[in-house]
């Protein structure tokens, strides 16, 4: 148990003995992109010291123990607060946790009265039962929250492994997925789409590369699609909270997949002694003056798409000189 938090709860008169304490496990994630809430202090039941001190945007606590079966008033104060007298009362939230339950709590929304459009009020999004590890060995479990105040209703498809299958049905701001996605711990590509399937943006989710096998994660849509209408705040992205807490991990924008290819010229026909090789009718040869019994090094070519390989004489001036072509796909 966090010693500081234990002291705060004792001071608040909430505990008489540790052994008698009913408790729940809670992870708190700061996803309010309002500049006024960039760093906050979090108080519980007006304790003399913040339970979470200097809590920064796009960070998370680890899973911590909190009292269950009693009302907890969560107070938010500026990050430079000196005590519970600095709590902004309009942001107070009261929760009552269930003994033995595990929760994910995400702070979302706007604190400022102006400068943001739209401006849904600051609130806590609560999900239970949370997970601290994957439910199946070898998997990664992912809970997803739509936490971008100005983003529309979207869905999420996986395009690298599942062939574009929709893994998150259309959901709107402030809504969690109904449960964790249970997926193999492999590198995925998550494509955010409008509900009609129109792609918006895609992100790599390198679960294997990052060693996230057996982990349970929380992914949040975070920031603003239109920063200019939101006090030039942080731009939209997908960020992931680890069960150990700390700074959220930003998912990188997806890159077009490539394959490594070596090409060897072994056509002994004198007419093909030296050729130029064009790909998809490009203006310049991808392989220039390619001679019999030579080879390219391994090169990157687009993967998963149709490639038209055009062969032209070695003195070609452009794709109009292609004399034969073949279609292929590399993965």
Can you say where each PLM-predicted feature lies in the sequence?
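Domain-scale selection of a single, long terminal region
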Residues: 8-10, 15
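Bacterial N-terminal signal peptides that target proteins for export
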Residues: 1-7
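N-terminal signal peptide c-region/cleavage motif recognized by signal peptidases
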Residues: 17-19
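Intrinsically disordered, low-complexity polar regions and short flexible loop motifs
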Residues: 21-331
């Amino acid at each position: 148990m966090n010693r500081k938090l234990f002291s705060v709860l004792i001071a608040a008169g909430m505990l008489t003995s540790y052994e008698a304490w009913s408790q729940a496990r809670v992870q708190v994630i700061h996803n309010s992109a309002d500049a006024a809430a960039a760093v906050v202090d979090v108080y519980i039941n007006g304790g003399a010291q913040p339970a979470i001190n200097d809590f920064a945007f796009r960070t998370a606590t680890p899973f911590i123990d909190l009292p269950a079966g009693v009302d907890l008033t969560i107070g938010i104060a500026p990050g430079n607060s000196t005590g519970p007298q600095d709590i902004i009362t309009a942001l107070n939230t009261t929760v009552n946790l269930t003994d033995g339950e595990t929760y994910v709590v995400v702070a979302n929304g706007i604190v400022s009265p102006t400068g943001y459009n739209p401006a849904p009020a600051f609130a806590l999004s609560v999900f239970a039962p949370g997970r601290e590890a994957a439910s199946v060995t070898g998997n990664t479990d992912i809970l997803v929250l739509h936490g971008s105040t100005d983003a529309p209703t979207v869905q999420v498809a996986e395009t690298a492994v599942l062939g574009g299958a929709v893994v998150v049905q259309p959901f709107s701001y402030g809504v969690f997925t109904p449960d964790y996605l249970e997926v193999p711990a492999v590198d995925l590509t998550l494509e955010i789409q409008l509900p009609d399937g129109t792609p918006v943006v895609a992100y790599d989710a390198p679960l294997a590369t990052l060693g996230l096998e057996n982990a349970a994660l929380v992914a949040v849509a975070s920031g603003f699609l239109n920063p200019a209408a939101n006090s030039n705040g942080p731009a939209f992205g997908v960020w992931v909270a680890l069960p150990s807490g700390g700074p959220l991990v930003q998912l990188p924008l997806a890159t077009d997949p490539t394959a490594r290819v070596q090409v060897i010229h072994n056509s002994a026909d004198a007419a093909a002694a030296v050729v130029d090789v064009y790909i998809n009718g490009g203006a310049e040869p991808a392989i220039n003056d390619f001679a019999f019994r030579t080879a390219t090094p391994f090169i990157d070519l687009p993967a998963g798409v149709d490639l038209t390989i055009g062969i032209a004489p070695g003195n070609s001036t452009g794709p109009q000189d292609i004399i034969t072509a073949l279609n292929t796909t590399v993965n």
